[in-house]
């Protein structure tokens, strides 16, 4: 079978997950217990070990059209036929059409990438990284405990933009918007806005805490 990166359009097994957004280069652990998804995993483990993760909004009962391909890098089979798997995000895709729905959803997808940058994105990336450090520093002060940034912060702007987006816990809709952007600069700029707002909020709380001491 040809690798997915060499095919512009292909069929891909799809796994909608409630309020979960996967980004390229980011890990996603899953526990597989539904029969249809056990069938899916058994099938893909005999081929290229890849499937598509789509964010499902349970409030609107809507599945996003843009998702991220996941590759199974580890699979543990349990005695009761459940599976514990670790996956890693690969490239993003857009669903063009549903091929079939049983025993599990399969879609016809096209791969999508960011447009070539029109500017040097390194300064924007450095701004985002500094904002991250500010947020961590202020969070540490508020919680009276040491919080360290993970050591795996990417240096390349595109990878950094995915890395930051993956840590926006509890904001699946915002994460989905960032996933769908095909402009690294626009993604980093939006993350700058989010982190600036977070930093300012934390700074205000820190001042209040110091005042009340």
Which residues fall in each region the model found?
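N-terminal low-complexity, acidic/polar interaction/targeting segments
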Residues: 1-213
């Amino acid at each position: 079978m040809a690798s997915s990166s060499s095919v512009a359009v292909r069929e891909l097994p799809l796994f909608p997950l409630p309020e979960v957004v996967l980004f390229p280069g980011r890990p996603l652990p899953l526990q597989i217990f539904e029969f249809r998804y056990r069938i899916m995993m058994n099938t893909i483990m005999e081929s290229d070990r890849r499937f598509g993760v789509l964010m499902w909004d349970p409030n609107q009962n809507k599945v996003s059209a843009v998702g991220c391909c996941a590759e199974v890098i580890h699979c543990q089979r349990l005695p009761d036929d459940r599976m514990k798997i670790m996956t890693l995000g690969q490239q993003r895709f857009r669903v063009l059409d549903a091929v079939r729905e049983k025993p599990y959803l399969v879609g016809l997808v096209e791969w999508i990438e960011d447009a070539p940058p029109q500017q040097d994105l390194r300064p924007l990336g450095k701004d985002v990284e500094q904002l991250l450090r500010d947020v961590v520093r202020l969070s540490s002060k508020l919680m009276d405990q040491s919080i360290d940034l993970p050591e795996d912060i990417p240096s390349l702007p595109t990878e950094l933009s995915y890395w930051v987006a993956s840590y926006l816990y509890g904001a699946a809709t915002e994460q989905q918007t960032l996933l769908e952007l095909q402009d690294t600069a626009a993604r980093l700029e939006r993350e700058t806005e989010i982190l600036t707002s977070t930093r300012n909020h934390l700074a205000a709380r820190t001042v209040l805490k110091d005042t009340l001491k």
